[in-house]
């Protein structure tokens, strides 16, 4: 069992929750140049992961599940990133409101 920082955020579109995300950052990954990842506050982790050449996604898994208790079952993806040689895990669940906003309700309801 390894100690980790857990970061949970909800992304909004027009003040409506559309993505629930959870990041797991092992404390051993939050040293040296990666230390800033442990102090992101409300800043976007995605900008840090996709903007920097020192980070790459090395594995992606599709998921069907609920991001939290009392939340609907929905599609998601889980990604493992390597940043400066250290791993971190990001799970994103695409809430039904996202599909409704983009006019693709069959994706959220027809496949589950």
Task: Please provide the spans of the model-predicted regions.
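Composition-driven recognition of glycine/serine/threonine/acidic- and proline-rich low-complexity segments
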Residues: 1-112
């Amino acid at each position: 069992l390894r100690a980790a920082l857990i970061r949970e955020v909800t992304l909004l579109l027009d003040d409506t929750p559309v993505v629930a995300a959870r990041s797991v950052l092992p404390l051993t990954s939050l040293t040296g140049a990666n230390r800033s990842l442990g102090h992101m506050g409300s800043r976007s982790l995605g900008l840090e992961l996709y903007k920097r050449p020192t980070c790459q996604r090395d594995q992606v898994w599709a998921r069907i599940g609920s991001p939290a208790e009392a939340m609907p079952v929905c599609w998601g993806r889980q990604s493992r990133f390597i940043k400066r040689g250290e791993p971190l895990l990001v799970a994103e669940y695409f809430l039904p409101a996202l599909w409704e906003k983009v006019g693709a309700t069959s994706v959220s309801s027809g496949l589950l």
